[in-house]
């Protein structure tokens, strides 16, 4: 391998133009001096994915054109596989998620600060949340909200009175939590009438607001399509997004005993290529971030050996500590007119109620999230079909469903490299219910949520009827052990992930604790960061897309304010023949002569 060709280098290379990576790319190039290359597996599908309807979003997420849908191993505790979904478009999962806007609680981020440093405390990152958003709703605490940011957040439209108010009142009483107007103020325990969504008003309706629309729009980069997928910065911005690329690995050069990240090897149009970074490489590949590190030789040696990868850096936590938010489902019979009121008020996002509550430990954030829909979405489909519970507006009553989420499960899984082939999917084990505490938590919250429905029925006996899944009679069993045994079976039957993932490159204070430090630098390297939800020591305690965007913004803050973590010493004068990589003879270089004002 000869000298690095100067036309094939950028200041930074970002792997992934997703929820966090797209933000980093935009913000780093705002000075029109810093040059950034982004390597993205997907293409721009902003127009195709603009629909604000939650059902459409859930359907789109199953399409492999814009999403990776990777089956897990057979999960022993539930007897079936789960599907790990992640974005495969510019904008990442912010382009096909359900659009719920949830920051997470002050307590959660203060726990991050306790674990890895005050730069992650809620007081340190509040300004990032505010700068990220344009909030168009009502709040009890205006100082907590932003009103001039790139991501639009709206409140749900609801009827003046009805089932939403009934369920929220019952939730407040039974779970002993307050009803608030706005849950995105750092508050931990609460219930609320109006959920919030990342959507912008347009033509008397709404469109999705995402990293793509807010940070990588036509004012920032040219807009690619299926036939011309790459995107270039406009108006002198030094940004290039290479779409339809698959990253193989990161290239390193050893300097004074430290592995310095200097380039990225990737595949585009069936050809292996290499590009170089003068200042740093940022991995923002979501579920695949740990896999890219492993393919680059960073990980636990026994994990790497199984895929035929030689160990460059023994980093035992890479691919471990994988977390998701799991839920058990409940179904309740409700008078149809009450459900139609909610469906009519906000057809795109007809949520019935929501709630958050703390975990058992005295420190840390929430563990419980409740989410209600006017359809049996959270009930196992086989039970819906067997009992004829599909929503039918002509019937006098229908089945609403409640997701009883564990947003800080004790069980942890893995995302591990399965093959040295960069096109191969990883081996994913979500490991649900591996810790029996999670099963007991779900059973306890089943019972508590049932008690909430009993209270709601007292408040509205003509509209709230019986619990049908699990059957109401189970909750009334006099034998406590029998009740819990039967409820455990319903937990296992309905237990599913909520497509919220992270933790497999978690932050820690040492390489024994984590994969990256509190400033996102990969232990054992220089000039290499990871910046996405995979760095979360504990997942944000709610729908985590907003948290992922905050991580991207904080990464930019670190890069700008802690440049000492990034500057590569003496690289320009060094010979690249001793890079820590496979022989790259025959690799094709990218001609960046058409890159607008590239350095």
Q: What is each stretch, according to the model?
A:
Residues 113-249, 253, 261, 469-470:
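Conserved redox-cofactor binding core of oxidoreductases
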Residues 243, 248-251, 459-539:
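A glycine-rich dinucleotide-binding beta-alpha-beta segment and adjacent secondary-structure elements
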Residues 538-557:
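A conserved FAD-binding loop/helix module that cradles the flavin
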Residues 571-597:
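Long, intrinsically disordered low-complexity tandem-repeat segments
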């Amino acid at each position: 391998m000869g000298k690095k060709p100067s036309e094939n280098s950028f200041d930074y290379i970002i792997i992934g133009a997703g929820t966090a990576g797209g933000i980093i790319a935009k913000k780093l190039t705002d000075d029109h001096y810093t040059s950034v290359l982004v390597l993205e597996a997907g293409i721009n599908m902003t127009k195709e994915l603009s629909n604000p309807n939650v059902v459409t979003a859930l359907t789109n997420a199953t399409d492999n054109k814009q999403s990776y849908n990777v089956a897990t191993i057979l999960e022993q505790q539930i007897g079936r596989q789960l599907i790990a979904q992640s974005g495969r478009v510019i904008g990442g999962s912010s382009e096909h998620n359900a659009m719920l806007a949830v920051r997470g609680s002050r307590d959660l981020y203060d726990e991050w600060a306790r674990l890895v440093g005050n730069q992650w405390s809620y007081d340190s990152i509040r300004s990032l949340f505010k700068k990220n958003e344009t909030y168009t709703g009502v709040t009890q605490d205006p100082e907590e909200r932003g009103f001039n940011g790139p991501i639009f957040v709206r409140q749900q439209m609801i009827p003046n009175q009805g089932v939403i108010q009934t369920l929220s009142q019952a939730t407040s009483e039974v779970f002993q939590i307050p009803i608030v107007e706005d849950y995105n103020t750092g508050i931990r325990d609460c219930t609320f009438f109006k959920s919030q969504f990342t959507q912008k008003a347009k033509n008397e309706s709404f469109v999705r607001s995402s990293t793509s629309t807010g940070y990588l729009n036509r004012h920032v980069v040219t807009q690619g399509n299926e036939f011309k997928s790459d995107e270039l910065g406009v108006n002198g911005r030094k940004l290039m997004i290479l779409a339809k690329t698959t990253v193989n690995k990161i290239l390193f050069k050893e300097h004074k005993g430290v592995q310095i990240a200097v380039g990225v090897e990737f595949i585009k149009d069936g050809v292996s290529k290499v590009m170089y970074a003068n200042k740093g490489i940022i991995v923002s590949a979501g579920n695949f971030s740990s896999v890219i590190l492993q393919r680059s030789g960073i990980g636990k040696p026994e994990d790497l050996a199984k895929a035929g990868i030689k160990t460059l850096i023994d980093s035992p936590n890479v691919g471990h500590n994988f977390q998701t938010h799991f839920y058990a489902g409940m179904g309740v019979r409700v008078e149809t007119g009450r459900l139609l009121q909610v469906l009519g008020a906000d057809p795109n996002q007809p949520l019935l109620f929501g709630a958050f509550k703390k975990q058992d430990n005295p420190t840390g954030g929430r563990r419980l999230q409740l989410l209600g829909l006017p359809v049996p979405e959270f009930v196992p489909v086989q039970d819906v079909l067997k009992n004829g519970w599909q929503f039918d507006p002509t019937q006098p009553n229908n089945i609403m469903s409640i997701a009883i989420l564990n947003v800080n499960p004790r069980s942890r899984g893995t995302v591990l490299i399965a093959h040295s082939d960069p096109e191969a999917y990883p081996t994913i084990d979500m490991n649900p219910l591996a810790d029996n505490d999670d099963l007991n938590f779900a059973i306890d919250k089943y019972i508590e949520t049932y008690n909430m429905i009993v209270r709601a029925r007292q408040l509205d006996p003509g509209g709230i009827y019986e619990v049908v899944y699990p059957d109401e009679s189970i909750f009334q069993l006099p034998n406590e052990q029998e009740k819990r045994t039967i409820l455990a079976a319903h937990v296992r039957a309905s237990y599913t992930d909520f497509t919220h993932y992270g933790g497999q490159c978690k932050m820690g204070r040492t390489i024994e604790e984590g994969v990256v430090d509190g400033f996102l630098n990969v232990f054992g390297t220089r000039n290499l960061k990871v910046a996405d939800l995979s760095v979360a020591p504990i997942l944000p305690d709610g729908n985590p897309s907003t948290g992922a965007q905050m991580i991207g913004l904080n990464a930019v803050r670190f890069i700008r304010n802690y440049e000492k973590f990034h500057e590569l010493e003496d690289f320009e004068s060094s010979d690249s023949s001793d890079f820590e990589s496979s022989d790259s003879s025959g690799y094709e270089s990218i001609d960046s002569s058409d890159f607008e004002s590239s350095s």
